[in-house]
Each structure stands twice: as structure tokens, then as C-alpha cells.
């Protein structure tokens, strides 16, 4: 897959090869220039990012911070100067199946007026709708106001809890929103904005998660936290946070959950992102629309086995192909599915995973 954008300088590639098997990050933020507005590019280094966006811009600084963590050019960027730029960009890039999308200029509680529905909507509701429409395996990582904006830790925590509480109240009042959230809440991660010297903690979290090592927990980062937050401070909330270790002088990511409605294994953000990685790697496009029979079933099984064997030991401990079947939805229509049993690292039991082919 190629991401093509208009070339205006000669120091960076006009066409970047996009490897969908990697955990790629898309940073959406504001530059100090109008260069490459709403265009998806990979700066391929800090010099090009500074040239494109301005060295002091929030987009360039976030890119540099992420690159220092991932140490590889898996970070794509978009210059979004207005709120409408975010909507236009998200609508046009989700089909690329980025692992993590980070809309830095948007907060979890931000809303916009949708002229199609004639009402105000949360951006994250619209993002979940698009993920459903495109059937992609992307995780949106959101944050909120920075901890330095608050007089005390209690006020900072109260603010974040209020945001989540109001969103959940809004969701449960609308049947359509509730149905969407019930199905796709795991596609959203909310992290507290509590790192010193970092404007957007969601960009840092995306970098931590993008390092492909499912055998261990995400690596700590070389940042201090503004407040010392503990597990008891975020009890029963769908909110990840960074915790500073005074011995190592680094910060870990704790309470790493997504915003899934149900309290089950799939609310674990590491499990969810591991499953999405499996789905991205399992390429069944050539079987879609095909007449289901014993031969097609065998081909799907062989394709899945080859892919899963290559992933075993890096993404998960073990797996089983439980079933491959066909679900009839109409007289001449239906879909093929594959059911897997996956044993993640850190677990003693298999978890059930079902993918529509």
C-alpha cells in the first residue's frame, strides 16, 4: 500500500511505503506552517519534520518525542490547522488501517455540530462510526487538559472523572450511541495528560504501544509526571495514566484499559491491540465474495495457519484454529468467519477471537 501526497520539497520522499503489518502511528496536530495541510506524510526524521512544520510546532515536537521512543520511522503525520481538518482527515485515512491514530488537538469531551444528523456529537462517537463503516482495526488514543492547568491533583482527577461520567451518561441516553459504543468502545483509549514536558500524553502512549513486543509490558519512558497518581485514584474508571518511578526516574503506563463498556478480558488494551494486529496480518481479501465450500475452507485454514505460526512466540504464546464456517444472512448472501483460540503472554488460558473473513 502506498500513501501518496503532493510533493513541495525535495528533502523527503513523495511516496512512502506503508507496511500494514507494522504498528504504525498517525499523529494529527497543528503545525506552524501551512505545508502539507491534510496530507498524510512520513517525515522520515526530525530534520524534515522541523522543515515541514516548524521546529517549535506541537506537531513537530510530538513527532520528535515519539521517534525518540520508537526509534523507527513508523510515525506518520498530518497538519490539521482547524477542527474540520480533523474530521476530513480521519474520514479519508482510516482505510489505511493505522494501528494508532492520535488526534492531538481534540480532547475526549470535544463535540461538533453534525449537519447530517442535525445535532451535536462527540468526536469519538463519529470516529467509532467511521471505524465501523471502514471495518478497520484502528485504536484512537485520546487525552484531555494537561495536569499543569489545574491547581491540585484532586481537581485534575475530578476533571477527568467528570469527562468520563458525562460521556457515559450521554451514551446511555441514546439507543444508537449506546449500540455503537457497546460494539466499538474498545477502539478508544483515554489517557490522563500528566507528563512533564509533554503536551499530549496520548502521543507518548501510542509510541509505547507501537513497539512490537507483546511478550512484555510497554517500556517506561524518560519523563516525569506532574502529579503522582495511584491505582486507587482511578479505581473503576476507563482511564490509563502514567506513573513515575522514583528509583528508575522513568514513567510507566498503568491501568492500561480501553473504553470498552464491558469489564472483560477484551477491555485490556494490550489484549485488544494484539487481536487487532492478528486481524491486520490475516489477509483474507481474496476469499471475500467467493462461494464457500470445502476447498475455500481449506485454503483459509492454510493461510491462517501460515500467518499464525509466524506470529507465534512474538505476539502470543499459542493458538488453535477452532472453527471456520459460513453465516447465511439472506437467500444468496452471507459471510465466512474464522474462530481462533489465542493464549496471550501473561495469561494461562485461551481467549476466544472471531474474525469475519
Language model: regions and residue ranges:
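A glycine- and small-residue-enriched flexible loop/hinge signal that marks low-structured segments
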Residues: 1-52, 57, 63-300, 307, ...
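C-terminal edge-of-domain segments
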Residues: 325-357
